[in-house]
Amino acid sequence: MPATDVGRRINHLVSSLQKDRTKIIIPTPALAEVLTRAERAGADYFTKLNRSAAFRIEPFETRAAIELARMTAMAIASGDKREGLSATWNEIKFDRQIVAIAKVTKVSTIYSDDENLGKLAKVQGFNVTTIRELPLPSEDAQMTFAWDVLHEEQEADDE
């Protein structure tokens, strides 16, 4: 089931992390995906992310390459370089780059709706949260609750 209220959920996450003074790490492979999907708005997104104190763009560099090699070697040694994933080998290598960057930058949680990325991240000990699992701001949650209650009352009246 796709997430609803995606923008509000993400904005609430960013606000919450900013209040806690937690940097939001964006691995460059993930940034490339976002910018590709954003098309014309990509340049504006990049400028905002790059200028914001809340975000830190992290490149795939030497430490991440070493971590990626370690992760891949362990998967190969286990007899399944794909670790049971149905993704293409290129997709798996791409997702492992993201996980390797997260690992060397000491990230605790990965936020993603990508099922394969989530599985790889969990194997490496990360908490994984999907957009659907992100809470709405409290006022939105209250409004949703009120709407649900009103809707249930209306259904009861109709019976």
Report each predicted region and the residues it spans.
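Acidic, PIN/NYN-like endoribonuclease modules and their adjacent C-terminal/linker elements
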Residues: 2, 99-159
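Short beta-strand scaffold positions
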Residues: 26, 59, 93, 111-112
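Acidic catalytic patch
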Residues: 55-88
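Alpha-helix capping/helix-boundary segments
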Residues: 30, 64, 97-98, 116-117
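Short, well-structured N-terminal submotif of metal-dependent ribonuclease cores
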Residues: 1-26, 35-52, 139-159
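Short basic/aromatic active-site micro-motif
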Residues: 29, 88-96
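Short catalytic/ligand-binding loop motif for oxyanion handling, primarily in non-cytosolic enzymes
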Residues: 32-37, 118-121
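Short active-site oxyanion
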Residues: 20-24, 54-56, 105-109
